[in-house]
Amino acid sequence: MFLHQNRFAARVEHMHTSMQRIPIMSTAPVIEHGRFAAKATVGESFQVSATVFREGHDELACEVVATDPTGVRRAPVAMTLQGCGVSQYAATLTPDVMGAWTFEVRAWSDPLATWLHHTEVKVPVGVDVELMFAEGSLLLDRIIAEHTLTAGDLVTIDNTRAGMCDQLRPIRARLAVALGHEIKEIFSRFPWRDLRSVDGPYPFFADRTRALFGSWYEFFPRSEGAKRSKSGVVTSGTFKTAAKRLPAVAAMGFDVLYLPPIHPIGEVNRKGPNNTLTPAPTDVGSPWAIGSAQGGHDAVHPDLGTLKDFDDFVRRANKLGIEVALDLALQAAPDHPWATSNPEWFTTRADGTIAYAENPPKKYQDIYPINFDNDPDGIYNEVLRTLKLWMSHGVRIFRVDNPHTKPLWVWDRLITSVFATDPDVLFLAEAFTRPPMMRALAAVGSQQS
C-alpha cells in the first residue's frame, strides 16, 4: 500500500489525464479559469483554498506556492484542512510587492503520515501489530537509502528499529519508541512527496493600497480663480489659480483630486448652456468634447496654462498628500486632430458624414465616438502613447469615462500593457451598466468603479 507508492510515483506523474493523481479541484481565487488575475493589495492577506482528496484512507498533504513579479518562487505555505468531510484545504498569502504574481496548489501522498496514523489506530488494539512495525522498518530503510544522514541520525534509526521490533518488550513500549520525538524529527527533515500533483499556476495581481479606496474630490480648474469683469467677460481659472485651492482640499481629508478633461475643447458643433447648439462666442463648450486645432488628448487647454503649469500643480498636490486623477475619455470633437489624420477611427454614415454620439433621446453633436474595429492597432498605440505621456507627468490614477461603451479588449490590452511597466497605475471605471459588464471591467484590470 503506502510502502510501495514511491515505486510507481514517477510513472503516474507522467500520465496524461484530466484528473491529477491526487485530485485538486475548486481552487480559489481563480477568475474565469485563470484567464484573468485575482486581485489583492500589497500587505493584504487573502485565502487560497482548494478541494484536495484521494481514494481510500491514505494520508495526503498540500501547500500553496506563490511566485512574485520578478519570477522568484516564494517559500511554500502549508494548507490546513478546513472542517471535516468536505476535503477543503486553505492557506493565507500576503503579497509584499506590487505587480503580477502567480500561485499554484501542490498536493502529494504522505507515506509517513499514513503509517503513523495506521499504527496509532491498529497497534493499541492489537491489530496487525508485527506487520505495522515491519512496515515501519521498511520506511527506515527507505530514508537511509534516499538521504545522506548524520552519524547521530543513523544511531537514532538503529535504536528505533531495535526498540519497535523487539517482540520481548511490551507493545505500548514498542509503540512509544516508534512514535518517539527523535525519529519524528528526522522524518520532518526529509519529508516524502509521493504521487505529486499540481494545480495552477493561476494569476493574481497585487496593487498598491490606494486601489482599495480613496477619498475623491472633483473640481474644474477653469472654475477655480475664474473672474467675471463688470462688462461680463469671464477670465478662466488656471492651474496656477486652482493650486491655491489644494490646501483646502487636503484639509477636508481628501487624498485624490479628480480633474475633468483638461484638453483643448472642440469648436465645431460646440454646445452652449442647456445643450444648445447656438453657443455664445464666450461659451467654452463641454470639456468632454475633446480636441481642436490647439491639440488633442495629449495637450493642455491654453486657457488653463502650460504643461509646466500642470506639472507644478501635480507636485503641489503631491506635497499635500493628494494624488491627481485625470479623466480618460476616448472620444473626439469633430475638429480633433484625429478626425483629420485618422478618419477611419470613426464611423462613416451613408451620407459620408461621421456619426456623432447618441444615447437616445440625447444627441451629442459635439462628440465623435471612436470605432475601435477599423484600426485596432493604430488606436491602441495612440491611446497607450497618450496614457504614458500623462503618466510621465505624474498622473497615476485615471478615471475612465464610460468604459462600458467601448469593446472590452481595449481595456484588457491597454491596462495589461500599462501594468507591465507601471503596476502602481490605477483605473476607475465610470460605468453605469449591468453586472456582467461591471464584472468584466474589473476582470480586465479596473480597480475601482
Describe the predicted segments one by one.
Residues 8-55, 114-147:
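Non-catalytic, glycine-rich low-complexity segments
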Residues 55-94, 118:
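Aromatic-rich carbohydrate-binding modules that target alpha-glucans
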Residues 80-133, 140-195, 200:
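Extended acidic/polar, glycine-enriched regions
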Residues 190-212, 323, 345-357:
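N-terminal carbohydrate-binding accessory modules
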Residues 213-237, 265-312, 340-377:
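Aromatic- and acidic-residue-enriched carbohydrate-binding clefts of CAZyme catalytic domains
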Residues 215-217, 257-259, 324-326, 398, ...:
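Hydrophobic faces of well-ordered beta-strands that scaffold small-molecule active sites
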Residues 241-263, 389:
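Catalytic domains of carbohydrate-active enzymes, especially glycoside hydrolases
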Residues 401-449:
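Active-site-proximal helices and loops of the catalytic beta/alpha 8
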